[in-house]
């Protein structure tokens, strides 16, 4: 499957696969192989697993406006195969459901992707001994959790972009009127009404994608009312406690942590507090922190020409 010439993914060939199924709803992963691989002899390519952002509520695996230019550029420079899964979203799902999907994806990746590459005669074969796990916003939590839940898969490095890695942060959990990405959400009473109405109407359904433009008001309401974390924890599950998981595993692959200091969606404090825990629990972890002036998703239009991004990519290349 080809992308339009003006797409950020125009240098890749796309193939979609069902990695799991929930109540007759397919969970899809897109595999993007470098187009130039078709012009060369068969070879092994490193794998970049990408978990999309959207506050666990909106977005989708190939929602282009939220894909960082530099990340696509870096993947191409490494001749990498990108694998981007969808997953169930809040509030129809819970955090436990989402991490069930994470588990199902990793099992599928290791059991099925090599044989799919073989049967489809891909010129680029996935090298599952070289995995880079990347996630934006909510997806950044899933990238870190992937390494903690599956240390046996030997993820070589992680990139966490403005992720809610630590939940006990007032700006994330305490309801209060506030401007988010330059916009004031509806007043608290109206916001609560919108949330309740949506949850009532969507009860029992499964959703794995949501246009941010169509669902933006709902997301703003959930953020303002501090509901994201409570919805994630609606079904108790030990996998949702990142610091506790980190204490159990005791280690983490090399981590490049990127976060805007002016983030009004996921407070920078979420990354700061996680780093404090990491330095106590696993002080030998190789970490690069890029705390930059900027809002949520501040890096999407940036390229590898930026010194700090080039330095971060060099950091990844030493481990991946």
From Swiss-Prot:
It comes from Phoma sp. (strain ATCC 20986 / MF5453). Keywords: Hydrolase. Its EC number is 3.1.1.1. The active site is at residues 137, 296. A motif (Involved in the stabilization of the negatively charged intermediate by the formation of the oxyanion hole) lies at residues 52-54. This is Probable carboxylesterase M8. Pathway: Secondary metabolite biosynthesis. SUPFAM superfamilies: alpha/beta-Hydrolases. Probable carboxylesterase; part of the gene cluster that mediates the biosynthesis of squalestatin S1 (SQS1, also known as zaragozic acid A), a heavily oxidized fungal polyketide that offers potent cholesterol lowering activity by targeting squalene synthase (SS). SQS1 is composed of a 2,8-dioxobicyclic[3.2.1]octane-3,4,5-tricarboxyclic acid core that is connected to two lipophilic polyketide arms. It holds the Pfam family Abhydrolase_3. It catalyses: a carboxylic ester + H2O = an alcohol + a carboxylate + H(+). GO terms for molecular function: carboxylesterase activity. InterPro entries: AB_hydrolase_3, AB_hydrolase_fold, Carboxylest/Gibb_receptor. The keyword Phosphoprotein does not apply. Belongs to the 'GDXG' lipolytic enzyme family. The keyword Cytoplasm does not apply.
